Structure formats: C-alpha cells, structure tokens
A protein has these predicted regions:
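Solvent-exposed soluble domains appended to multi-pass membrane proteins
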Residues: 1-294
C-alpha cells in the first residue's frame, strides 16, 4: 500500500509507522493529482488508526481521508464497514461534491478474517455451490490450509460490491476511469501447490472512459507502475512528475508489447516469461490448468 500512496519502492517497513513528521514525497500520489487540479480523497473501510493511515494519507497530499469512523449509520463487520455500504457512502460523497474532478483511492476491508459478513442480506451468493466447487477441484486433504467455502463466499461478495459500485458510478459519471488492483496477493487461493506467481502477483484491471484507445505496453508490472499508467491516460500532454515506475499502456497501436521488461516488486522480480522470488526459486509462466465449474 505504501507504494501506491508515496510512490516509493515497497519494503516490509511501513512508512506510515515512522516516528516524527513524515515529509510529503514528490512522488506521492495525492500530491501529484492535487497538482493536476483534482480534489483528492482517500477512503478506507476500516479504522483510520490502522497504521495511522488517516494522518498518513493526508500528509501525502490527499485533501481528505475517510475511515469507518466517518461513515455513519452503515453496517459493520469485525474489520470495518461492509464493502457495499462503504461504496454507497463514496457514491453519496461524489454526488455532493461533483463541482470539480476528483481522484479517489479506495481500500476496502470486508475480505479479511473472520469473514463474518452477512452476504445473503445483499447478494444471492450460493455458498453450497462454492462448497461443491471446492470439494470437486480441491478436496480437503489437497486444499491449502484453512480455506473454507465461507472465505470464498466473502471474496465473491467483495467482488460483487466493487462491480456494483463501478457500474453505478460509471452510469452517473461516464467520464470516469477505474483502476482495480490488490494491496497484496490472494491469500485465499485454495491450491496447496502455490507457485511464485500465485503467492506474489496481483491483478490490474482498467475500465472506463477512453480505455479502448490504449494497448498493453509491457506484460509485467508492479505497484509502482500503476500511477504512471493512470497519468498517461488522464494527465495533459507534457505533464512532468516524479516516479520510479513506467506506464504499462501506450496509445501507439503500432508499438510492440515488450515481454522482456523487468518488473520489481517487494517479493519478486518478473518479466513476461519468468518470475523469480530471490530465494533461488524461478517459475516459468505457463497457462493454468482448467477447472470444472459446477
């Protein structure tokens, strides 16, 4: 998460927990988008006290930072506000303050232990169907430790909540662009034979206005490349900014995809063909096996 907020390389030392006053780095995301004229907001569906994320994000250029304590009259789980309730709050906030463009960074919280979300209250998610899928493809004796149908049910709930928010927001603000990613790899993946790709990678999904004008430039990237990608698609021509990353897309349809460019993450390095975790383990990236859906 630090890399997305400060633009610095990711390490296992949380910048937010440093003692003393933290400077606003030139590469900080909030600072850059504020410079571009955006109203910058950070939303976290858990407590703002977690890793001091409330004061941390405002110190890095976000105009406002919202935590669960700012989101009133919404259903809460052990970890924080229900994802769909938090997304509703954000949409309400956008409707109240639509007089200028906004940049909004959102960190949801429902997909965390103890997975105590009342999913049936909001979505008709069939837990038994998920249970059958697990039993068919990953019998208990061959399943990664602790993975249960309830965990995957909450995962599906979180996905549906985000999808609903994107749909509603895009209908109200059709010039919006959404960048969907994770702050860490998927810990609920049931396969016990976890390759480096599974245990270190995250997705990046780009959806919205004008996305069709761009094509993939590199096959491998990391968190540090996401903000440069957003800026490539939204900032005015010639805008200069500080970053350790590069845009992952290009508007030059004739440019070939670079499969050799190396992406550096906190736990691994990779290009379009290989991924290495620094511990002597090298994986060749291949197509995953097909699974039977129930």
């Amino acid at each position: 998460m630090d890399m997305m907020i400060t633009g610095l390389y990711g390490t296992y030392f949380p910048v937010s927990e440093m003692t003393g006053k933290i400077p606003c780095f030139d590469s900080s995301t909030g600072r850059i988008f504020k410079d571009l004229g955006y109203d910058t907001n950070f939303f976290y569906f858990g407590s703002s006290a977690w890793r001091k994320i409330g004061s941390y994000t405002t110190s890095q250029g976000f105009n406002k930072s919202y935590g669960m304590e700012n989101i009133h009259n919404k259903q809460k789980s052990t970890w924080g506000i229900y994802d769909n309730e938090g997304f509703d709050f954000i949409l309400e906030s956008l409707d109240k303050h639509h007089d200028k463009p906004t940049f909004n960074m959102i960190l949801s919280a429902s997909n965390h232990p103890p997975y105590d979300i009342d999913t049936k209250k909001y979505y008709n998610i069939d837990t038994e169907k998920i249970r059958n899928f697990l039993d068919t493809n990953y019998p208990k004796e061959k399943r990664f430790q602790g993975i249960t149908p309830e965990i995957l049910t909450v995962t599906e709930y979180s996905i549906k909540s985000a999808a609903d928010f994107i749909k509603k927001t895009y209908e109200s603000y059709p010039d919006s662009i959404f960048f969907i990613t994770g702050d860490h790899f998927d810990r609920s993946y049931p396969d016990p034979d976890r390759k480096i790709f599974t245990s270190t990678s995250i997705p990046l999904i780009i959806y919205g206005s004008g996305v069709h004008k761009y094509k993939l430039k590199y096959t491998a990237g990391s968190h540090k490349d996401i903000v440069p990608t957003i800026l490539n698609m939204t900032a005015h021509a010639g805008y200069k900014f500080h970053s350790f990353g590069q845009s992952l897309v290009t508007d030059d349809i004739n440019e070939n995809i670079d499969k050799e460019r190396i992406a550096i993450g906190a736990q691994s390095i990779a290009n379009g063909r290989y991924i290495f975790n620094g511990g002597g383990n090298l994986n060749i990236l291949t197509t995953k096996k097909k699974m039977k859906m129930i």
